[in-house]
Amino acid sequence: VNIDPVLKALMAALHGEGPAVEIVQDENGGPQAVPVETGVEDAAVVVRTSGSTGTPKATVLTIDALAASSVSTAMALRGEGQWLLALPLQYVAGVQVLVRSLYAGTRPWVMDQSNGFTPEAFTAAAEELTDKIRFTSLVPTQLQRLLDSPAPETLAVLRRFNAILLGGAPASPDLLATAHAEGLKVVTTYGSAETCGGCVYDGEPLDGVEVRIGEGELEGRILLGGDTVAAGYLDAARASKAAFFEEDDVRWYVTGDLGQLSDDGKLTILGRADDVIITGGVKASASYIQSKLEELDGVTAAFVAGVPSREWGQAVAAYVAVTDPTPEGIKGFTSRREAALGVLAPKTVLADKELLMLPNGKPDRLAMIDQLSKLHQGQ
């Protein structure tokens, strides 16, 4: 994949010598930097939110925000190095691989994903890296594939990375335990397009990033503040006003997540603010049910949502990734889930080898909810 034209346009935008750009796919599936008129001073990059919970929004990132993000990332990772690109460039995590490379003065290596993400292609790309200090960004699904019966050469290249940033979706405790047992330097990240990507590493805010928990109307919400926060959404004044605010010269972004801060300032993400399911008058947390399902033998990932139900108002439904999606395997899972969750056990379940995913590695919530709703209604 030739990314030189994209790097050139991105460098011009970051230096204020060219227009802001959005990286999109061209007709051949390759990356293309398209100039965007934002009306925002010092705008450098426009990235789309993933759209996992609704319509994707075009987020405007400034030169200063991206510079602050790169500097704080380098401080957290104790240096700059060469990056391997294994994520789509139209989303913030992919763009940031290029941005960090440009600030570091190193050449990123692009993984060949013409046949999708495979351990073989990742290993081949990682073997091409030349810098002693190496980084990559992955989503949990990718790391799971790399660690499922890994070849010795795959483990060897994974261990060579000074840090593997893991974000886009929560990583299961089992996946993190496996990665650490194999000697991988995995760093869990939390953030979004609105914060130039990950701005909290292993629960700790990056330098210059502030985290607090909302009160009043924003009770329990995670609020992220500091120099990495976006200028706003393109052509969406109402959405920008709801998501961003200024206070004491600090710009803040209101996330859709609930969290808590420990006494020493470590952030724990508790789940989405909209994840409460009211079924038959009983309140249930989708993230709690998801975590219980993921503790069951044979379950590698789970997604839980409420779907419309004539009988219950909402019914608990789950899409689960299982190691054995045969009828016999699913029968065993059914008895285990009822034993673990009782009345909160999902009434409607779809099981497959993997969850439905968006191109950026986040769960495709809308697609899974649609399928679960149809199944629950007998369609």
Predicted regions and their residues:
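AMP-binding/adenylate-forming
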Residues: 19, 61-69, 82-145, 187
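Conserved pre-ATP/AMP-binding loop-to-beta segment of ANL
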Residues: 31-48, 80-82
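Conserved AMP-binding A3 loop
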Residues: 42-71, 78
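Gly/Ser/Thr-rich phosphate-binding loop
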Residues: 148-202
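Conserved ATP/PPi-binding loop(s) of AMP-dependent carboxylate-activating enzymes
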Residues: 205, 216-244, 284
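AMP-binding/adenylate-forming catalytic core of the ANL superfamily
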Residues: 226, 251, 258-343
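Conserved ANL (AMP-binding/adenylate-forming) active-site segment centered on the GW(Y/F)…HTG consensus within
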Residues: 229-256, 273-274, 290
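Conserved C-terminal "lid"/linker of ANL adenylate-forming enzymes
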Residues: 277, 304-305, 317-321, 335-379
